[in-house]
From Swiss-Prot:
Protein name, per record: Large ribosomal subunit protein uL2
Compositional bias annotation for Basic residues: 258-276
PANTHER family per record: LARGE RIBOSOMAL SUBUNIT PROTEIN UL2M (PTHR13691:SF5), RIBOSOMAL PROTEIN L2 (PTHR13691)
Gene Ontology MF term list: rRNA binding; structural constituent of ribosome; transferase activity
HAMAP family attached to this UniProt entry: Ribosomal_uL2_B
Domain of life of the organism encoding this protein: Bacteria
Organism: Moorella thermoacetica (strain ATCC 39073 / JCM 9320)
Phylogenetic placement of the source organism: Bacteria, Bacillati, Bacillota, Clostridia, Moorellales
UniProt subunit comment: Part of the 50S ribosomal subunit. Forms a bridge to the 30S subunit in the 70S ribosome.
Ranges for region Disordered: 225-276
InterPro entries referenced in this protein's UniProt entry, alphabetically: NA-bd_OB-fold (IPR012340), Rib_uL2_dom2 (IPR014722), Ribosomal_uL2 (IPR002171), Ribosomal_uL2_bac/org-type (IPR005880), Ribosomal_uL2_C (IPR022669), Ribosomal_uL2_CS (IPR022671), Ribosomal_uL2_dom3 (IPR014726), Ribosomal_uL2_RNA-bd_dom (IPR022666)
Amino acid sequence: MAIKKFKPTSPGRRQMTVSTFAEITATEPYKPLVEPLKKTGGRNNQGRLTVRHRGGGHKRLYRVIDFKRDKDGIPGRVATIEYDPNRSANIALINYADGEKRYILAPENLQVGDQVISGPEADIKVGNALPLSQIPVGTMVHNVELKPGKGGQMARSAGAGAQLMAKEGGYALLRLPSGEVRKVQESCRATVGQVGNLDWENINIGKAGRKRWLGIRPTVRGVVMNPVDHPHGGGEGRAPVGRKHPVTPWGKPAMGAKTRKKRKLSDKLIVKPRNK
């Protein structure tokens, strides 16, 4: 993925960067694998706001992605590499030998015409999915399952990849993108390679309106609100927070306070916590 810069013809364009989409080979998705996607505006089924800063944005269609990669022993060929508005990674349409078509996350260096296959007997090749027990130590993987057969849940965003560090006692040790080292059952599946679209992290949004196209609304600081709206609000002029530690709009500790549940069952599987 290459990045395009603009001449500073306006304040919004001055720092803006966009992808050239050079690797995209199709402009329209494969209709049978597309579903309607209803916008929530951050509201739940009671109409109450549960996630702030959501709303608006361009209309999207959901592409059904095969995270399970459970079509064993049947080779498939990459038909297209496509843009997906619902994630940072690109997706690849796979034509399988039995006639079925599925979308998968497009790994780095996967090209149209390449062959991919799933199953314990698959080769160690970019785009192939197999159990961690069959993958050599040191390999970069993505779309990693947490429970066998549930489908990939870890290392799915653009540029993400987990490194297989070791195998012992029925578990594989993975170093995740966050720096966390974690045990995962050897029977869990992963896809070989790193997720593509590596330059995603270097994209500069450039202007507020582009955030609105993505369905992200403005974030207002609590310190500029009124006391009725936020614990940091109120005061004459530019007043400080006025507390020992910053808090959320609901009075819970914010900015650095740990939010992970204590004595969580998965704690015993985490060998080294994520980087601060």
